[in-house]
Amino acid sequence: MPIQVLPPQLANQIAAGEVVERPASVVKELVENSLDAGATRIDIDIERGGAKLIRIRDNGCGIKKDELALALARHATSKIASQDDLEAIISLGFRGEALASISSVSRLTLTSRTAEQQEAWQAYAEGRDMNVTVKPAAHPVGTTLEVLDLFYNTPARRKFLRTEKTEFNHIDEIIRRIALARFDVTINLSHNGKIVRQYRAVPEGGQKERRLGAICGTAFLEQALAIEWQHGDLTLRGWVADPNHTTPALAEIQYCYVNGRMMRDRLINHAIRQACEDKLGADQQPAFVLYLEIDPHQVDVNVHPAKHEVRFHQSRLVHDFIYQGVLSVLQQQLETPLPLDDEPQPAPRSIPENRVAAGRNHFAEPAAREPVAPRYTPAPASGSRPAAPWPNAQPGYQKQQGEVYRQLLQTPAPMQKPKAPEPQEPALAANSQSFGRVLTIVHSDCALLERDGNISLLSLPVAERWLRQAQLTPGEAPVCAQPLLIPLRLKVSAEEKSALEKAQSALAELGIDFQSDAQHVTIRAVPLPLRQQNLQILIPELIGYLAKQSVFEPGNIAQWIARNLMSEHAQWSMAQAITLLADVERLCPQLVKTPPGGLLQSVDLHPAIKALKDE
């Protein structure tokens, strides 16, 4: 057989083998075209799982009459025009293959109208040479695409379609993923004349959690931890479910987007799985909805026929950025201590004696630590990056990328005003800022400590209360507020409303944000220590306390809240006690020098030693 150029229809059918896998593939390509056209409303009508009819209607910018024939031609697009555009793709579509491929395996009709045109025009391609016919039509501004009898002329492909229910489930999943990517677009999905999904557009700054709950379910919403992580041109936003409460049903929720494009990327999944591995079983999977924003020049989306995968120019950097972003939220949720700096310090104040037993940042240590220590690194403060390398970091990557990677994982020292030179004080003893070494747990809530040969008992609930008070008390800046996924709405009396309004500035310093109307108050954000509390009990009690006060000082309110917080530990473990002491020593060093009543009690061993010697 001689070499010859294939007919246009046959060439398009071959290309359709990569682009059009099943009806859901058609829906994905056409809806993405609608989004690229600036549509704010998209209606999808499906019949018989998409095998009979797929109709996509949008209110986008439309297509001019002169461009309708080009729209159905191969490699014709308005989204890129040069090599530079290909290297920084910001649109969902860019190859110009979808419509030509779909029209070659179905009866496709394209109807469109722009705002400048007085009438709409309809185009369809038919025949061996795919000649396009254009005729007038009635249509509002926007575009409608009808795909009839998918694979009617390729029986082999049609034979491999699954049942109507299965094919529609694939379409439904595609729409769910797209709806999570574009909260600003109204999307309606119907099957066989019956409306199945209605996702209303969320206004800018609105409650995205309503759509999140409609798509992912209330179980995910209740366990979701919000992520907001940024470094340079990299931004990570979204939600990850608490791994301690992940169920097999929740594990099916794994939605990831890169610059608004839905992805199934192994690098991203590995980073998330690695961040959660200490809290997940071997057969468990994390649940997440995450949005990664990156400079378009740093990612290549033209590596997969269906554009399901991307390639990052600095894959290691992106991997560890995502890993650290997810890990930081999980660590904050567990309220673990800040990382210890590995650089030399003026005095060893920040490394108490018992931190060796506690397991300081062992990612930076070559030797293995005691198994009592947590496997994870302590969580960074908001916006910070730990300075230690990751446990699986590969030493052989390039120096230039290594420098960028090092900058990602380090936090610049805050700018401070120069101070006048002061006389150098003698360095403190290594254990002068430490309660001592934890020996064991006594009666489930007391830690037996040893320091300088002396034994003492420390009340862990009291230490936890002092820590909460320190975390809640504002310093030079207000306490960071954590937005609630589901705001808490409470009915209040006129007296309580007046007290709340008077205390609003003090509460704002504590990270408590609310809005009030005639008879209700809506709590929108709380500080981190309150995130896991039963707010439906705590907040009304706080409002009752404020109603009895005449002066509203943040410190007094923080003290009241700390005393009324429920402890997360019914029984304390050694690791939990060591972690708590590390936090208290860091945030409340004055308690080490002058322990308040009820916190620390020395144990006199001399009578026991004397009795032993007298035997």
UniProtKB/Swiss-Prot annotation:
One of its GO terms (biological process) is mismatch repair. This is DNA mismatch repair protein MutL. SUPFAM superfamilies: ATPase domain of HSP90 chaperone/DNA topoisomerase II/histidine kinase, DNA mismatch repair protein MutL, Ribosomal protein S5 domain 2-like. The keyword DNA damage applies. The gene is mutL. One of its GO terms (cellular component) is mismatch repair complex. PROSITE patterns: DNA_MISMATCH_REPAIR_1. It comes from the Bacteria. Keywords: DNA damage, DNA repair. This protein is involved in the repair of mismatches in DNA. It is required for dam-dependent methyl-directed DNA mismatch repair. May act as a 'molecular matchmaker', a protein that promotes the formation of a stable complex between two or more DNA-binding proteins in an ATP-dependent manner without itself being part of a final effector complex. It comes from Escherichia coli (strain 55989 / EAEC). Residues 363-397 are annotated as: Disordered. CDD domains: HATPase_MutL-MLH-PMS-like, MutL_Trans_MutL. Residues 364-391 have a biased composition (Low complexity). Belongs to the DNA mismatch repair MutL/HexB family. The lineage of its organism: Bacteria, Pseudomonadati, Pseudomonadota, Gammaproteobacteria, Enterobacterales. One of its GO terms (molecular function) is ATP hydrolysis activity. NCBIfam families: mutl (TIGR00585), PRK00095.1-1 (NF000948). SMART domains: DNA_mis_repair, MutL_C.
